[in-house]
Amino acid sequence: MTNTATNIGYITQIIGPVVDVEFTTGKLPQIYNAIIIGSGENAVTCEVQQLLGNNKVRAVSMTSTDGLKRGMEVTDTQAPISVPVGKATLGRIFNVLGQPVDNMGDVALDQTLPIHRGSPAFTQLETKPSIFETGIKVVDLLAPYRRGGKIGLFGGAGVGKTVLIMELINNIAKAHGGVSVFGGVGERTREGNDLYMEMKESKVINESNLGESKVALVYGQMNEPPGARMRVGLTALTMAEYFRDVNKQDVLLFIDNIFRFVQAGSEVSALLGRMPSAVGYQPTLATEMGSLQERITSTTEGSITSIQAVYVPADDLTDPAPATTFSHLDATTVLSRNLAAKGIYPAVDPLDSTSTMLQINIVGQEHYSCAQNVKETLQRYKELQDIIAILGLDELSEEDRQIVARARKIERFLSQPFFVAEVFTGSPGKYVSLADTMKGFNMILNGELDELPEQSFYLVGNIDEAIEKAKSLKG
């Protein structure tokens, strides 16, 4: 950020991450302007949030306010926080201010953009809904993603969220020539580090040639002040917007975790003197969420498809934070611990995951019928499981036994080997087109493959591989 401004003020009050500054000249910075306290490595950047009157402004710090004191000089940069964008960001890790934090040298600042920008105009939006093919069978068939849509990713610890995220990053790069931006918002530093290491291992980040990497990472972790956690999502979004608007690419934007964005806003809200709203959240909750979510969309040039991990506090879906998030989502991908325990990966729950795209007028009759028949078979199997547990399979009618056999094949066929998991599964990854996916499930539902053993459907790509696997199992 260039320090061309000469508008100088002085700190009058510090309350945690909130700093009050008086500009004696009477020339006040605009809302969202970045102001800098100190210089060099110890410089503290704050963002103006309120104009208090009497030539004073209230700002929220993006870094720790330790060591600041009243009377210190403050410089108005006369512009919002700006971050680097473009190819130089790929393979690198940034903080909320767009500074690299991976000890791999500086990033070229040829192109920077402010993190506060308007959403695209109505005339620029792509209004025709289209499916974003991921190459992952269970997602494309049962809960398809909308191009330029927002997807909620729900799942506890250890059920495969990270691996699913990395596979999506890999597939968008290979199939769509797109890139991804990962925004780590208020999550554990250890998880951020693990993700970075796994991305290097699976070649999503190419260490020898960073420009060939498929992702840029932006972190504002749990130990950072609320100001950083509140704005890091916007930093990641700004980098994604450049790839969409200038490079005209399809972009995947991951936000982990969207709840922490709201949480950071509520921490700052009371310090800014706002009256708390329901459950202690900020009164501006819907506005803040809307200003972030409305920028995530498809334009006629490219698209940003966002996948947001959603933490649900105390599993209460009516809590204002997740409830506000739900109103923006086009699809939900729910990861199931039961499926993970069975070794079925990706552990996406086919009955709990939903999508607004699964409508006849969008996906067509064939896709819709296939998806509904798969869900119907799995639902019936779920209902029969109690009877099977108590009385055994032999007590079922012939028709029910056939449903159970097909449902078990469907369940296994919903599993799939991932490219990014080759390192630890030893089996090559598979990208399965939607046409191949539908062909396979229709053959199972029609009874064409009733004689094949169910293990031949486990961890394969398309249905031809399952038939080949069955032959090799027979030996």
UniProtKB/Swiss-Prot annotation:
Gene3D superfamilies to which the protein is assigned, alphabetical: 2.40.10.170, Bovine Mitochondrial F1-atpase, Atp Synthase Beta Chain, Chain D, domain 3, P-loop containing nucleotide triphosphate hydrolases
PROSITE patterns reported for this sequence: ATPASE_ALPHA_BETA (PS00152)
Main location (coarse class): plastid
Highest taxon of the lineage: Eukaryota
Database matches in Pfam families: ATP-synt_ab, ATP-synt_ab_N, ATP-synt_VA_C
Main EC class the enzyme belongs to: translocase
Matching InterPro entries: AAA+_ATPase (IPR003593), ATP-synt_VA_C (IPR055190), ATP_synth_F1_bsu (IPR005722), ATPase_a/bsu_AS (IPR020003), ATPase_alpha/beta_chains (IPR050053), ATPase_F1/V1/A1_a/bsu_N (IPR004100), ATPase_F1/V1/A1_a/bsu_N_sf (IPR036121), ATPase_F1/V1/A1_a/bsu_nucl-bd (IPR000194)
SMART domains for the chain: AAA
Subunit structure: F-type ATPases have 2 components, CF(1) - the catalytic core - and CF(0) - the membrane proton channel. CF(1) has five subunits: alpha(3), beta(3), gamma(1), delta(1), epsilon(1). CF(0) has four main subunits: a(1), b(1), b'(1) and c(9-12).
Protein name per UniProt: ATP synthase subunit beta, chloroplastic
Gene behind this protein: atpB
